[in-house]
Amino acid sequence: SGIILDKNVLQDINQRVTQEIDKLYKDIILQLNESYSSINLNSPKQLEELLFVHLNLPAIKKTAQRTSYSTDHEVLKELSKIHHIPKMIMRYRELFKLKSTYLESLLDYVNSCTNKIHTTFSQTSVTTGRLSSSEPNLQNIPVDGFLIRSAFKSQEDNLFLSADYSQIELRVLAYLSQDKVLLDAFEKDKDIHAITAAGLFDQDQETISSEQRQIGKRINFGILYGLTAHGLSKELNITHSLANDYIKKFMSQYVQLNQWMESVIEDAKSKGYVETLFKRRRYVPGINEKNKNIFELSKRIAINTVVQGTAAEIVKLGMINLDKAIKKNNFNAKMILQIHDELILEVNKSDIEKVSKLVKDVLESVVDWN
């Protein structure tokens, strides 16, 4: 298997990104005094002085070691609301990471004989059961990754076919909780994020704005990862009280979901572990802890494991069934990459329509939801 990587394309992208990095650096430096003419924007210590001493911006939080003030992505994002330079630094860091982590390192993994990259997948690195990719990690290409993806090429007369499970974790959540609102939304192909937003803002779904829908989306996905009023208030830049109101409205809107989550927690307290739909077990030792922080973390782990773990198993079973079906039909196609809820196949042009239909049929029939 493996994926062909066009070195020339990647080198061209690297050159363009390098030019953008250099321009961004110069634009930042021009707005500072001469003492910062050679500042290292990747140095937390130098950034700390620039942001909190020179620019006199408010320090938001300490580092994990509590020896200095943090300049991480979360801090820069907050500071960007009151000053433009932190936003420029964020962009600089994103591009620098793209260059150092992907554009330069990917070339080292290209097989000189085949011009292909072969990633390594692990079944056990992620506690929820998801597959993980390493050497190189092809599951974690960032937002600017569309540039990098253009360097991946199919073999002659072949095409790439992408198949992505739509909102698989929310659909799994609907099935496991049997929440009437969630089930109705997915059965009738409604906009679940707009439905949530309508409940939050006491409006008809048709009147929901794109900004309101984004809030609904943030809460829908956040609930899978233990969304708190504190986290939501920071994410949306709203008061803690309003964030708490949003969460309360969500819980009253999705009654069966709330009851199901409580039952998962109680079951975990009793057994000491949680299980996915396919009986994959994960122990949650902190679920009976009196320490509030440990207990809250354990609750998030319990819910997330059941939902994300079940979704991961569905994808894996889909991969197994699809591989068998491709071989049975003798199609000129093969899976070359799994990116969590998405499968990438390389398919001969002559088989593309038949394989597209096969992929849809196989992946949608992994579980009998009835």
For each feature predicted by the language model, list its residue ranges.
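Substrate-binding beta-hairpin/strand module that engages nucleic acids
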Residues: 188, 193, 208, 263, ...
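C-terminal structured "cap/appendage" subdomains that terminate the fold
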Residues: 322-370
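Short, contiguous acidic/charged loop-to-helix segments that flank catalytic cores in large enzymes
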Residues: 107-110, 162, 182-184, 207, ...
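Conserved catalytic core of nucleic-acid polymerases
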Residues: 118, 124, 198-331
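Conserved "right-hand" nucleotidyltransferase catalytic core of DNA-directed polymerases
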Residues: 1-144, 157-159, 166-169, 229, ...
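Short, hydrophobic beta-strand segments
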Residues: 1, 219, 223, 303, ...
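Hydrophobic, well-ordered secondary-structure elements that form the walls
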Residues: 43, 129, 164, 197, ...
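Function-dense linear segments that define catalytic or interfacial modules
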Residues: 120-205
